[in-house]
A protein has these predicted regions:
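Pro/Thr/Ser/Gly-rich low-complexity, intrinsically disordered linker/stalk tracts
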Residues: 1-32, 66-69, 78-91
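Extracellular low-complexity, O-glycosylation-prone stalks/linkers
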Residues: 26-58, 73, 82-88
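Exposed aromatic-hydrophobic patches
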Residues: 58-64
Length: 91
């Protein structure tokens, strides 16, 4: 069994200025990862929702509530497990 993937770097969340219900999430891909779990929620310690993205370095998030602050974090995935969770990003 190999090593767990390296943590994700340069994780960014940018809410759309014209439609704040949408956000572009991007990151630098880990060379040893095949996918990523993006966690999000309305409090930094309550990231109860998860989106899994395979083979990409971005995700176009749609459906955020207007006037609500969201918090996001990401981890990389491979056959050996998951990386450490990134720092939480507020948006």
């Amino acid at each position: 069994m190999g090593e767990k993937p390296l943590p994700v770097r340069n994780f960014k969340v940018a809410r759309d200025k014209q439609d704040k219900r949408n956000a572009m999430i991007s990151w630098n891909p880990s060379s040893d990862a095949y996918g990523y779990n993006i966690y999000y929620g309305i409090a930094p310690e309550k990231l109860y929702n998860c989106i899994t993205v395979n083979g990409a370095d971005h995700y176009d998030f749609r459906g955020l509530d207007l006037g609500t602050t969201y918090y996001f974090a990401i981890e990389a995935l491979n056959e050996s497990g998951r990386s450490a969770l990134s720092k939480v990003v507020k948006q």
